[in-house]
Curated annotation (Swiss-Prot):
It comes from the Bacteria. It is a multi-pass membrane protein. Residues 105-124, 173-194, 367-379, 706-716 are extracellular. It catalyses: Cu(2+)(in) + ATP + H2O = Cu(2+)(out) + ADP + phosphate + H(+). The chain crosses the membrane at residues 84-104, 125-144, 152-172, 195-215, 344-366, 380-397, 686-705, 717-735. Residues 1-83, 145-151, 216-343, 398-685, 736-745 are cytoplasmic. Its main location: membrane. This is Copper-transporting ATPase. It comes from Helicobacter pylori (Campylobacter pylori). GO terms for molecular function: ATP binding; ATP hydrolysis activity; copper ion binding; P-type divalent copper transporter activity.
Length: 745
């Protein structure tokens, strides 16, 4: 059984990986993925052995709060920005008290100059008050940090909580010594760390605020798409307009769409017209004109006139619902490259605590001064610095932020990745297999030429009247051509469709009722022929003389034209060193012509679904990493077999289950965009990981005091600043993906 839920209380990747590790050990858990940024979790478990309530109890024991849905955050009296501002103000106040006299004695009143026991004690008490206020604004670090430590799942908050608490306790002890006059020399006289506690918390809070703002911006961009779902719609029932819940709409319902409203479900216009903003699907800002017979999709915006539409999908199966599901999966899943960071994070925090304790003991022993309290002060500074400077967040954010921003960028390009692994794998593709009809071509054959043995208008009238009864794309092409030439309609009876061959009907022909047939050559037993040398889709029109003989009256030659810009985009793909293949069920001449025209390396014609499947198997057996690009319908087996499946979606025709990547642009450029975005994302992740590993590898030893003899020691305050800058640098580097652009050549 698969379930999705949310977990509150996580602060860094050590939290999320700790939950995964703890639950992953359970025999009834098959798979679990926890995402730190959007607080989501996906789990697959054996429902015969446990249930979701039991899993929630296990997570609660670890110190976190699992919930089926995320409750809206309660509005607090002080906003996060106000809290941060107050923390900064009181930190500056404490720093002023502790260091003002060092800059200039005139900066402090004489009563606070710490020149005697009384002024020292008064100054320290004011520092303590300011410190407690700053700690109050940063209390979440202590609540979450000590809770995680209690449950043996230490995280970044645990490091901050332990380090600053140790500094506070030491300062309180020094304050006691001053108050009781038990100090021994200048080193033990009022050696406080209140300013270190405040500065550490302030820098960490600033870093977290920048981190959260960046994360929220990326998540808000995604959630804005989800907000395109209207709650109600106007249903036409018994000639009355009734406002109904979108969830109650069923296929076939007639809905009225007013100007300035969102489309509730997928459907088809049956009366009126409109201009729709489909940017949430395609990324294109220009409105799209829609008329009777055109499809409209949920979540798109009707800007001007009102129209009537018939629902073709319910809310659950609508285009917007499928996009929301894909976004949720993409945000919640993890890329393979993140596994390394997770493995390191799982042992990182305990290792840092061990290193800090070891460094404390060593410095207590080897510190150069004979005085114990001076040595204790140096050892404590090293202990706090090691805890504070280590940055598990940078490791966790390295992949999560890049993938989050990349998915946001993809949606603006009309691309949706099924999960993080799809985003990661697209860059490795070295072979792309294209379907032809509807993928490389428009999927709407148009009449190229007409060959008639009877009067042309009569031939068009016969074909128009019969093909009007068919939904086939070829039939629509002939009907459109006949309309352009004002061909009249005839009355039809006894309409019969032979799937895959053609359609026949009885109609008036030269004053008598005749059976007229329209279809491919296999549909006829002709007693005469037509000499046609053109390549294209051949559709014959004839009269049935008897059951075994047909008289040909004429023929249409149609062609399915390549989409605009396809040739250039195929060339872009080939410039990446990728081999291209065209697999189509069309005849050899048409497929060959298309492949040559577009510059595709190889092709297979007359290909049935099994033939396409076998070709992809063959390519994979040769070690190729194959991307299949199709329409998601008759290509489903091939899409499932490929390493990366791309569906060129046409609204509700999209098959999310078969697709790794869905393009609502219905444009081959999106294939190139997906590959380039994948490359840029993985490069960005590697940059983040490199920085995170290098930072911790260099700065933790520095905090331990390895360069003491070179007079280089990091104070706890500087350590806090370095840790915050490390996380912020990873976040800001990930934001560079927002500026990702596709070059046209």
């Amino acid at each position: 059984m698969k379930e999705s839920f949310y977990i509150e209380g996580m602060t860094c990747t050590a939290c999320s990986s700790g939950i995964e590790r703890s639950l992953g050990r359970k025999s009834f858990v098959k798979k679990i993925e926890v995402n730190l940024l959007n607080k989501s979790a996906n789990i697959e478990f054996n429902e015969n052995e446990t249930n979701l309530d039991e899993i929630f109890k296990l997570i609660e024991k670890l110190g976190y709060s699992p919930k089926k849905t995320l409750a809206e955050e309660k509005k607090e009296f002080f906003s996060p920005n106000v809290k941060l501002a107050l923390a900064v103000i009181f930190t500056l106040f404490v720093v002023y008290l502790s260091m003002g006299a060092m800059l200039s004695p005139s900066l402090l009143p004489k009563s606070l100059l710490a020149i005697d026991n009384h002024s020292n004690f008064l100054n320290a008490c004011l520092q303590l008050i300011g410190t407690l206020i700053v700690m109050h604004w940063g209390r979440d670090f202590y609540i979450q940090g000590f809770k995680a430590l209690w449950h043996r799942q230490p995280n970044m908050s645990s490091l901050i909580a332990i380090g600053t608490s140790a500094a506070l306790i030491s300062s309180l002890w020094q304050l006691y010594l001053v108050y009781t006059d038990h100090y021994t020399d200048q080193w033990s006289y009022g050696h406080y760390y209140f300013e270190s506690v405040c500065v550490i918390l302030m820098f960490v809070m600033v870093g977290k605020r920048i981190e959260n703002v960046s994360k929220d911006k990326a998540l808000d961009a995604m959630q804005a798409l989800m907000k395109n779902a209207p709650k109600t719609a106007l249903k036409i029932q018994n000639d009355q307009q009734i406002e109904v819940l979108v969830d109650s709409i069923v296929v076939g319902d007639i809905l009225k769409v007013l100007p300035g409203t969102l489309i509730a479900v997928d459907g088809e216009i049956i009366e009126g017209e409109g201009e729709l903003d489909e940017s949430m699907l395609s990324g294109e800002a220009l409105p799209v004109y829609k008329k009777v017979g055109d499809k409209v999709f949920s979540g798109t915006f009707n800007s001007h006139t009102s129209f009537l539409m018939k629902a073709t999908q319910n809310n659950k199966n609508s285009t917007l619902s499928q996009i929301v599901e894909m976004i949720h999966n993409a945000q919640s899943s993890k890329a393979e490259i993140s596994r390394l960071a997770d493995k390191v994070s799982s042992v990182f925090v305990p290792s840092v605590i061990a290193i800090a304790i070891l460094a404390f003991v060593v410095w207590l022993i080897i510190a150069p001064k004979p005085d114990f309290w001076w040595n204790f002060g140096i050892a404590l500074e090293v202990f706090v610095s090691v805890l504070v400077i280590s940055c598990p967040c940078a490791l966790g954010l390295a992949t999560l932020m890049s993938i989050l921003v990349a998915n946001q960028k993809a949606s603006s390009l009309g691309l949706f990745f099924k999960d993080a692994k799809s985003l990661e794998k697209a860059r490795l593709v070295n072979t792309i297999v294209f379907d032809k009809t509807g993928t490389l071509t428009n999927g709407k054959p148009v009449v190229k030429s007409v060959h008639s043995k009877i009067e042309l208008l009569e031939l068009l009238s016969l074909a128009n009247s019969i093909e009007k009864s068919s939904e086939h794309v070829i039939a629509k092409g002939i009907v459109e051509y006949a309309k352009e030439h004002n061909a009249p309609l005839k009355e039809m009876s006894e309409v019969k469709v032979k799937t895959g061959f053609g359609i026949s009907a009885k109609t008036d022909y030269q004053g008598t009722k005749e059976i007229i047939k329209v279809g491919n050559s296999e549909f006829f037993n002709p007693i005469n022929t037509l000499e046609i040398q053109e390549n294209g889709i051949l559709v014959l029109v004839g009269r049935a003389i008897n059951e075994k003989e047909d008289e040909l009256l004429g023929a249409f030659v149609l062609e399915d034209l390549p989409k605009k810009g396809v040739k250039e985009h195929v060339a872009q793909i080939k410039n990446l060193g990728i081999n291209t293949f065209l697999l189509s069920g069309d005849n050899r001449e048409n497929v060959k012509k298309c492949a040559l025209e577009l510059g595709i390396d190889g092709y297979i014609s007359n290909a049935k679904p099994q033939d396409k499947l076998n070709k992809i198997k063959e390519l994979k057996e040769k070690g190729r990493i194959v991307m299949m690009v199709g329409d998601g319908l008759n290509d489903a087996p091939s899409l499932a077999m490929s390493d990366v499946a791309v569906v060129m979606a046409k609204g509700s025709d999209v098959s999310v289950q078969a697709a790794d990547i869905v393009s609502f642009n219905n444009d081959i450029k999106s294939v190139y965009s997906a590959i380039k975005l994948s490359q840029a994302t993985i490069k960005n992740i590697k940059e983040n990981l490199f920085w995170a590993f290098c930072y911790n590898s260099v700065f933790i030893p520095l905090a331990c005091g390895v360069l003491y003899k070179a007079n280089i020691m990091l104070s706890p305050a500087i350590a806090g600043l370095a840790m915050s800058l490390s996380s912020v640098s990873v976040v800001l580097n990930s934001q560079r993906l927002r500026n990702f652009k596709i070059k046209d050549h």
